[in-house]
Every structure is written in structure tokens, then in C-alpha cells.
Amino acid sequence: MDSDQTPLINPSLFEECAQNHFAATDPRSRRPFHIEPSYITSINDDDPQRITSVASAMNKRIHYYSKLSNPSDKGLIAPDHVLPAPEEIYVYSPLGTALKIDGSDGTGKNSSIVTIFMIWNTMMGTSILSIPWGIKQAGFTTGVCILFLMGILTLYCCYRVVKSRGTIPLTDTSNWEFPDVCQYYFGSFGRWSSLLFSLVSLIGAMIVYWVLMSNFLFNTGKFIYNYVNDVNVTDDVLSNNGSDKVICPNPDSTRPLNKSMDTYFGNGTNYEQFETWWSKTNTVPFYLVVLLLPLLSFRSPSFFAKFNILGTVSIIYLVSLVTLKAAHLGFHLRFSWNQVQEFFVPEFRLSFPQLTGILTLAFFIHNCIITLLKNNRNQKNNVRDLSIAYLLVGLTYIYVGVAVFASFPSPPLSKQCIQQNFLDNFPSSDILAFVARIFLLFQMMTVYPLLGYLVRVQLLGHIFGDIYPSVFHVLALNIAVVGVGVIMARFYPNIGGIIRFSGAACGLAFVFVYPSLIHMISLHRRGQLKVHSILIHVSIIVLGIANLIAQFFM
């Protein structure tokens, strides 16, 4: 028993090393737990650093037991109580360096700048294409105010999600995600309802992606066909005059048309055949099935994850495109609260809930924010970094939304012509818009399998306990998800409508209801629940419910 209390490192050497433990220039401050004698060399011509026989014996036992079974077998892994404390363990590299392990929870990987950028990059999605349309639906002044207020509200709710794990006493929640917190407070209902709303957000995103990919593939193919065959096509729609052409595809309706309207100059028969086989809603959504259905069946999405940088490149290019177009077109604004005008919209419109639905999804990161912040090097900065990230996201949305809305040439075009995907306001022959569509198309084709993988993990993993139970199960799920996307792209290609419905639905649970309820329950259990807190958080829940209900009346 006395031998168990023997220090692993000779006390005199340990105390001497401890004095210089934080001195980066002292090589002894990076001493590994154990080094084989053949690796021990003199340091600055001093005597070699010797390790006790107890440490040497323990090292040999750990190596011995690790070879008795398969590495995947957990039965013979050394238990925690026989290992040194985390602060005494070093990872020794054959390259000659030793890395100190600060803790066993794996935190402390990324700086604040990296964390902020990760959150910004994760939140920047397809919603940015519909922000100008949402501002048009709400009115310019009202839309900008709603953007600001929704950013603050969703940030507060996200803050409550981050703090939710800390409200659980006497339990190690270091590896918990927000659905685990929901299960703790609401039981199996919390678990399955969080799964349901998470699937709503994922499948909604996949539907939007399918509609947009059909749109981008159609316009890309049309541009290439016209260029290769030297076809001179002018869009037979309302447009402005000038080199930076802006069009109004649907002057009398906010619903996208199922066919393009062009006047062509060339071989009419060939062009008519091309239009028959290359239709935005009748054929192109089905062509995507051949491209994407096999990709959804991959067991691992690691290959597609390598292309995540394309999302950042696409957003930067979109912002640059909007800046360039706005500089050339100039601003066209006229403020009016009540007067109905031919080319402008009122500053306040009753259809503003369409923007709140879009923004709920645009600011939605609540189901994965805990995971993103786990790797923050300084956990004390989580709230600050989250706030900065939300500020940058909000500024990006406001910049794109205001620039597109304000620079839309009115007159001769009405602001009502702003499309749910603002790239549709640029003709297929626009080279800058063509490059943007190419970027977004390729980026979405790499992200779509990742979304499908997440759906598979959450649905099949919960039902069967295996994310790949069989080829038949995976294929059936993929066909169902792809089928929904094809149907929506064929009969309801309105990304603004899809985004606002899915955003209001998943946001009801993850943004408005669960964070507020969990906070009130935790305060009640500690005897700290006050009337003003009840009023604030009940109001947030009511706003979430009203946001969802209002989408059905727009």
C-alpha cells in the first residue's frame, strides 16, 4: 500500500521542474509523463532527466494491456484513477515536442476570432437571398427595424440556450447538447419534439436547396446554351435601360412563373426544343435526381465537408456583387407611410410577418451553438463572441437587404418586382450573376449531402439505433427526401414561402419556447422566479406562436 503513495517522479526533480513549470524557455517544463531511457538525452549539457522506476513500470503495464485486445475493445483500457492528473500528462511527439494537456474535456481549441467566424459562416445561408424580398413585404423602414429587433431577440434566446446546461445541478453536462437539456426538463417529449423540429429545419433547408439548385442549374444551362450556339436572346419582360440590366419577371404576381419568357433570334426550332427539355420546373428538378441521389447514399460525408469554404466564398462574392450593382444603379427611395404609389411600397405593410418568419431561420443557430462554443479557447468569452457574431450576421443581412432594395431601379420598375431570390432580378445573360449562380450551385451540391447525412443520423439513429441500418432503409429515406424537394420545385418554387414556414416552425421550439421555459423552470426550482421574468419570457413564447400562426394568413 505504501508503494501506491510513491510519487511517480523523483520529488527533488519534480519540485525543481514545478518552479519553472510556466517558463516556456525551460525544456524541463515540457517533460512528458514517461520517456523510454533510449530517448533521454542531456539538456544544455546537464545530466539526463531520470524517471522513477514506478513511472517506468506503469508505462510498461499500460503498453502491455493495450496489446492484449483489439483497440476498439474498451475492457482493458487503463482506468482514470491509475493515470496522473490531466495537468501532469504530456503528449510526446516523435518530432521532438511535448504538448501539455490542459484538461480532459477537449475544450480550448479555437481563438475568439475563429469562433466568431465559425458562427458567422454557419448562420450565413440561403436566407440572405430572400432578405430584400422580406424587406419589400414589410416596408423599408419597418423591415430594417424588424431586422434589428429580431437579431436582438434571437441573440437573447441563443444566450439562454448557451446558459441552459449550467442550470442543471449535480450533473456533468460538459458533453450535453441542447436536445439533452430538453430531455432533462421535459422527458421523452422534450427529446422527440426537439428531434421533430430539428428535422423540420433540416428538411426545410433541403427543400430550399433543391428549389435553388433547380433555378441555378436552369439559368446556368441557359447561359451556356446561348453562348455556345450564339443565340441572341432578350428577356420579354419589364426591365430598365442601361448596361446593368434589372428585370421584373412577374409584374402582376409574386409567384414565380413556371416558364421563361424570351424573344430569340436564331434557329427557332432548335431553341424551342431546348426550352421543352430545359424547363425550370418541368424538367431540371428531375435532372438533379440523377446527380444528387447517389451522393446521399455515401456512408460518410467527410469528402463533402472539405468544400465548406465555398460557402464563405459565395457570401463574399454575393456581397461584392450587391456592392457593385448598387454603385452602378444608385439608390431609388421614396418614403411614404400611407400613400399608395405606383413604383414604391409603403413604409409599413401588414405582410411584415413574412419577414419575421424568414429572419427566424436566418438567425437560427440555436440547435448547434453549444457544439460551436465548446471549442472556444476561453470559455469566459462565449457570450461576448456570440454577441459579436450575431452583430456581424445582422450587419451582413442589413447591408445586403438595404442595398438591393434601395438600388432597385424604381422607376421604371416597381419595388413590387423584387423577387424571393433577388438573383432572379438579373437576366440569365448577366455574367456577374452567372458566376454567382455557378458558385452557389456547386456549394449547394456539396452541402446537400451533408444535410441528408444529418437527417439520416437524427432519424434513423433515433429509430433504429444505427445511422446505416441497411441499404434499403437509407435508399428509402433518400428517395422520400428527394421526392419532397422535386415536388416543391415543380409545384411551389417559392423559396421565401418555404423559408418563412420552416423558420417559424423550428424557431417556435428552439428559439422561443424551449429556452424561455427552461429558464423559468430553473428559476422556479431555485426559488428565484420573479413576476417581471415571467412576463418577459411568456411574451417571447407568445411572439413565437403568433409568428407561426401569422404565416398561414400571408
UniProtKB/Swiss-Prot annotation:
GO biological process terms on file: amino acid transmembrane transport; asparagine transport; cellular response to amino acid stimulus; glutamine transport; L-arginine transmembrane transport; positive regulation of TOR signaling; positive regulation of TORC1 signaling
Glycosylation sites: N232, N241, N258, N267
Pfam families: Aa_trans
UniProt short sequence motif CRAC motif, positions renumbered to this chain: 450-456
Annotated S-S bridges: C248-C417
Keywords assigned: Amino-acid transport, Disulfide bond, Endosome, Glycoprotein, Lysosome, Membrane, Metal-binding, Sodium, Transmembrane, Transmembrane helix, Transport
Membrane topology recorded in Swiss-Prot or TrEMBL: Multi-pass membrane protein
Topological domain spans for side Cytoplasmic: 1-112, 161-191, 294-302, 371-387, 452-472, 522-533
Motif CARC motif, residue numbers: 437-447
Compartments in which it is found: Lysosome membrane; Late endosome membrane
Processing after translation: Glycosylated.
Domain of life: Eukaryota
Signal peptide as annotated in the record: none
Keyword Transferase among record annotations: no
Reactions catalysed: L-leucine(in) = L-leucine(out); L-tyrosine(in) = L-tyrosine(out); L-glutamine(out) = L-glutamine(in); L-asparagine(out) = L-asparagine(in)
GO CC annotation terms, alphabetical: late endosome; late endosome membrane; lysosomal membrane; lysosome
Family indicated by similarity: Belongs to the amino acid/polyamine transporter 2 family. SLC38A9 subfamily.
Function (record text): Lysosomal amino acid transporter involved in the activation of mTORC1 in response to amino acid levels. Probably acts as an amino acid sensor of the Rag GTPases and Ragulator complexes, 2 complexes involved in amino acid sensing and activation of mTORC1, a signaling complex promoting cell growth in response to growth factors, energy levels, and amino acids. Following activation by amino acids, the Ragulator and Rag GTPases function as a scaffold recruiting mTORC1 to lysosomes where it is in turn activated.
Name used for this protein in its record: Neutral amino acid transporter 9
Source organism of this protein record: Xenopus tropicalis (Western clawed frog)
Phylogenetic classification of the source organism: Eukaryota, Metazoa, Chordata, Craniata, Vertebrata
